[in-house]
Each structure stands twice: as C-alpha cells, then as structure tokens.
C-alpha cells in the first residue's frame, strides 16, 4: 500500500504557507496589473533600444523574456556581461537555436538601462 501511495505522490511538497501565499498573490489584482504593465512597457522599451544596437536583433515576446539574435557567440556575450554582473541565458542548447541566440529577462528600467549600456559597449 505504501509503495502505491509513494508512486502517486508529487515529486515535491508545497507547504501550506506557500500555498496560501500563492493564492493571495493570484487574488491580489493590483499587483498583477502593475506587474503586467511593467513587463509590457519594459518589454517594448528593451526591444526598441536593442533594435538600435549593432549586432543585435530581438524577437517579439509578450512574456518577461526576450530572445536575442547576436553576431557575437552566446558564450562570449554571456561571459562579458557576467563581468558586469548581468546574467543572460545562453540558448545554444535550445532545439532549433544555435550559438548566436541568448535570452534576456525584462526587468525594471534601471536594470534594463544597465543591460542596454553594456550591450552598446560590446
């Protein structure tokens, strides 16, 4: 009987406190609306800014991530940005992509400006 129950158990446990916090966050509409607006506005700002930078182009996204195509190898770009405390995702292992793709996160304006300045300097 115990073996059967263990097979049905989800691979991780979520505490009651975490469940309640998630429920409260989902129900807190002002926060969700503010977050959606921030992501939408900063996403547009990043795409517009990056499109002006040589060697970079970006794909449309309605999420808090943007896929970039770069003429710089993804691992090289990742290392250069890491030196400036900026994390990006190397997408060379993603199916259908190669070493010329990275993913950036849409963040607050201050962080996005830091990323743009770093990309311009490369």
Residue positions per predicted region:
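Residue-level "edge-of-site" marker
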Residues: 18, 62-64, 94
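Residue-level signal for well-ordered alpha-helical positions
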Residues: 7-8, 80, 118
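Short secondary-structure capping/turn micro-motifs that flank functional sites
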Residues: 21, 41, 67, 97-98
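PLP-dependent aminotransferase class I/II
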Residues: 1-52, 56-58
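PLP-dependent enzyme catalytic core of the Aspartate aminotransferase-like
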Residues: 72, 83-84, 95-122
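Conserved PLP-binding catalytic core of the aspartate aminotransferase-like
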Residues: 40-44, 50-85, 106
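Short loop segments at secondary-structure junctions
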Residues: 1, 27-28, 70-73, 109
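Short beta-strand->loop
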Residues: 87-93
């Amino acid at each position: 009987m115990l073996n059967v129950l263990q097979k049905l158990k989800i691979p991780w446990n979520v505490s009651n406190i975490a469940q309640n916090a998630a429920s409260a966050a989902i129900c807190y509409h002002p926060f969700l609306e503010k977050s959606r607006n921030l992501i939408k506005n900063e996403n547009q700002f990043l795409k517009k800014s990056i499109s002006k930078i040589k060697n970079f182009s970006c794909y449309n996204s309605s999420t808090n991530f943007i896929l970039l195509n770069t003429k710089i190898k993804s691992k090289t770009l990742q290392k250069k940005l890491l030196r400036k405390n900026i994390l990006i995702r190397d997408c060379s292992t993603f199916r259908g992509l190669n070493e010329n793709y990275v993913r950036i996160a849409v963040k607050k304006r201050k962080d996005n400006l830091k990323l743009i300045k770093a990309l311009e300097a490369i």
